[in-house]
Design a protein with these regions (language model features):
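Active-site beta-loop-alpha junctions enriched in small/polar residues
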Residues: 17-19, 44-46, 86-90, 116-120, ...
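Non-cysteine beta-strand/loop elements that form the S-adenosyl-L-methionine
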Residues: 37-47, 108-119, 176-181
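Core AdoMet radical
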Residues: 17, 44, 54-60, 113
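N-terminal small/glycine-rich loop or linker at the start of catalytic domains
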Residues: 1-13, 45, 50-53, 78-89, ...
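Glycine-rich, positively charged N-terminal anion/phosphate-binding segment
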Residues: 1-37
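Glycine-rich tight-turn/loop motif centered on a GG-T
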Residues: 48-65, 95-96, 124-138, 193
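Alpha/beta catalytic cores of nucleotide-metabolism and tRNA/nucleoside-modifying enzymes
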Residues: 68-71, 76-78, 89-91, 95-112, ...
């Protein structure tokens, strides 16, 4: 069963991909029944296969649809619903258009935005290239937090050390670590002590 997980993995989020509000609603009910702690909507993946299914980063061009999907999810489940996106796609303006996207989407009731601090190019770059070639723009994510202080803004993209994470936390509410966590998980052994002064044991 692909949705099985060990009790020790809590808190655990599940990421959903899609643009059909009803289908997403049905998936969210299953996720809550299976005891996930959070539902995250994928509005950041640029792969051609994902685009062909009308979800992922291409949805940044349809903020009203993203809003409607999230609104239905939030009304359906009791667990938190969040969204993960880029700072823009293709020729979108990183300043004006990102603010517009967040302004529309937050009307769904979604309070947490996880922002990959790169643009996504929907044509001409592979998913791997989209994680590396578009330049990181952390300052843009910081400005987004300044513009929307009532929202929880979590930064993502190219963050490799706990020192980096602590620096980002001076400007945003949270940090998401991706590739570096699975490529080299061992530095995370001491992360609880660095951030909370607690020592928690894990078995790898």
């Amino acid at each position: 069963d692909l949705l099985n997980f060990h009790e020790s993995e809590h808190p655990l989020a599940i990421q959903l991909g899609g643009s059909d509000p009803v289908a997403l609603q049905e998936a969210s009910v299953i996720a809550e029944e299976r005891d996930f702690d959070e539902i995250n909507l994928n509005v950041g993946c640029p792969s051609p296969r994902v685009q062909s299914g009308s979800f992922g980063a291409v949805l940044m061009k349809q903020p009203e649809l993203v809003r409607d999907c999230l609104e239905l999810l939030i009304k359906t489940v009791k667990i938190p619903v969040t969204v993960k996106c880029r700072i823009g796609v293709d020729e979108m303006d990183e300043d004006k258009d990102l603010d517009k996207f967040v302004q529309i989407v937050k009307d769904s009731g979604c309070k947490t935005f996880i922002i990959h601090a790169r643009k996504a190019w929907l044509k001409g770059l592979s998913p791997k290239d989209n994680r590396e070639i578009p330049p990181l723009n952390y300052e843009r994510v910081y400005r987004l937090k300044d513009s929307f202080p009532d929202l929880e803004v979590i930064i993502n993209g190219g963050i490799e050390t706990t020192h980096d994470a602590l620096e980002h936390l001076k400007r945003v509410d949270g940090v998401m670590v991706g590739r570096s966590a699975y490529a080299n998980p061992y530095p995370l052994v001491n992360v609880d002590k660095k951030f909370t002064d607690e020592v928690i044991g894990y078995q790898l």
